[in-house]
Amino acid sequence: MLALKEANLQDAQKEYEFVRAIPENENGFTNPDFGVSFEEFVSVSLPRMIEWSEGRNLPDGFVPETYLFLWEENEIIGQFRIRHHLCPSLIEGGGHIGYFIRKDLRNRGYGKKGLALTLEKARKIIPENEIYLRVQKDNPASLHVMLASGGYIHHEDAHHLYVRIPK
């Protein structure tokens, strides 16, 4: 059974192993913890994730952001992030939600299922009437996930499609 769990210290080893496998930037999903040691992950990265989800110690211009891991039994399948509200840089940037599914598990429905679970949580947090997402034009699989989740293409630029999902 799939479940979302917020980043936490109890699952640090498995969270670290998952985060360590995420590239520094893939399809617009950035990994600020790329290349960190386990010790740094536990002492810096995880506390930051937890603090940011609570709106504490945010850098200037950042909004609260909840880090969620998608689990199937004892295995992490993906990471989803909910930014709690929009700021100017998020409106034409990453929007409310970003996600990453493990490469070896893509095209198996985990993106759709994980986004559905994330949307349930996001609808309780986000004050805007629509949930904003952005996808690179060369990532049709992720666009398909967003559209299958009730999204529509709101607009585009040279490199991205901007998707909205009604709340």
Residue ranges and their predicted role:
Residues M1-H96, E156-K167:
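GNAT-family acyltransferases
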Residues A3, G98, Y132-R134:
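Short aromatic/hydrophobic contact patches that present stacked aromatics
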Residues A12, I91, R108, P140-L143:
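Loop/helix-junction capping segments adjacent to catalytic residues or to phosphate/diphosphate-binding pockets
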Residues R83-H85, H96-N107, Q136:
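A short, internal acetyl-CoA/4′-phosphopantetheine-binding micro-motif in the GNAT/acyltransferase core
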Residues A122-R134:
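Conserved GNAT acetyl-CoA-binding A-motif
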Residues K137-H155:
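Conserved active-site alpha-helix within GNAT-family acetyltransferase domains
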